[in-house]
């Protein structure tokens, strides 16, 4: 039977559970940056693949099924907006080390649902990614709406 992984807020801490047993805890104010890897345009919550949480010396890698991108992100919009530390990148432009990636349906792998990784291992990869942000999910949604309007100002066009 597969283990059930969950994340939840407890005060100023984010707690990681495996089968309802606490396995890790991070003090949220210690988070320096959160990077969400998404499929396609990342328009729907189901497009999120991984959340990478950067601390001073470590990165926490969460698979989408842990709820970090859902429960933890959505329950405290004001916290993330104030911190301005949430970034986004398409999985087409960013790749994790093979041991951290989850396989597709046709080639499943046993990648971890949650793992702590030394920051020096992931920093060179993340620094090479073309990150969008900082922006919360709500800010990202409104940007998509603005960009889809007819006659919307295109920041890429120059007079």
State the predicted function of each range.
Residues 1-159:
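Eukaryotic intrinsically disordered, low-complexity regulatory linkers and tails enriched in Ser/Thr/Pro
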């Amino acid at each position: 039977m597969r283990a059930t992984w969950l994340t939840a807020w407890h005060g100023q801490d984010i707690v990681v559970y495996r089968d309802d047993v606490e396995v890790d805890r991070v003090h949220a104010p210690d988070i320096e940056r959160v990077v969400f890897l998404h499929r396609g345009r990342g328009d729907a919550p189901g497009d999120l693949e991984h959340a990478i949480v950067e601390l001073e010396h470590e990165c926490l890698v969460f698979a989408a099924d842990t709820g970090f991108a859902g429960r933890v992100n959505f329950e405290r919009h004001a916290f993330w907006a104030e911190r301005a530390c949430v970034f986004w990148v398409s999985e087409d432009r960013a790749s994790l080390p093979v041991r951290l990636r989850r396989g597709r349906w046709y080639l499943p792998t046993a990648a971890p649902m949650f793992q702590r990784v030394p920051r020096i291992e992931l920093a060179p990869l993340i620094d090479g990614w073309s990150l969008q942000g900082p922006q919360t999910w709500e800010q990202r949604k409104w940007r998509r709406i603005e960009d889809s309007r007819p006659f919307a100002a295109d920041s890429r066009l120059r007079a």
